[in-house]
């Protein structure tokens, strides 16, 4: 994706620069979804092995939930890092080429919306 960047290391999942970014929140909906996906994976595992779906292997279901949340946490950290790099490059380009991005004139809501005439 970003192979042309200087200093790019090909087989590194999360570079050291990602440590400066704030960590994802633990109640992020995407992490909750990953935990739910892990729980459903545990249920599917029980179903495929013909065990009682909800009651058998609760420790395995907990293991699936924690491992999916753990993997999702680092996936979110990587996604946030890639978005930060993209934003940094984009804003750097905007700073270097201001003639391509002229300032728009500010309009008030009165100029945008139609006048309001109440009907009685």
Curated annotation (Swiss-Prot):
Predominant location category: mitochondrion
GO cellular component: mitochondrial inner membrane; mitochondrion; respiratory chain complex I
Topology in membrane: Single-pass membrane protein
Compartment(s) where it occurs, according to its Swiss-Prot or TrEMBL record: Mitochondrion inner membrane
A Pfam entry, by short name: NDUF_C2
UniProt keyword annotations, A-Z: Electron transport, Membrane, Mitochondrion, Mitochondrion inner membrane, Respiratory chain, Transmembrane, Transmembrane helix, Transport
The organism's place on the tree of life at top rank: Eukaryota
Keyword Magnesium: no
GO biological process: aerobic respiration; mitochondrial electron transport, NADH to ubiquinone; mitochondrial respiratory chain complex I assembly; negative regulation of non-canonical NF-kappaB signal transduction; negative regulation of reactive oxygen species biosynthetic process; positive regulation of ATP biosynthetic process; positive regulation of mitochondrial membrane potential; proton motive force-driven mitochondrial ATP synthesis
Regions that span the bilayer: 57-76
Record's keyword annotation contains rRNA-binding: no
Record function comment: Accessory subunit of the mitochondrial membrane respiratory chain NADH dehydrogenase (Complex I), that is believed not to be involved in catalysis but required for the complex assembly. Complex I functions in the transfer of electrons from NADH to the respiratory chain. The immediate electron acceptor for the enzyme is believed to be ubiquinone.
Quaternary organization: Complex I is composed of 45 different subunits. Interacts with TMEM242.
PANTHER family: NADH DEHYDROGENASE [UBIQUINONE] 1 SUBUNIT C2-RELATED, NADH-UBIQUINONE OXIDOREDUCTASE SUBUNIT B14.5B
Family: Belongs to the complex I NDUFC2 subunit family.
Protein name: NADH dehydrogenase [ubiquinone] 1 subunit C2
Species name: Mus musculus
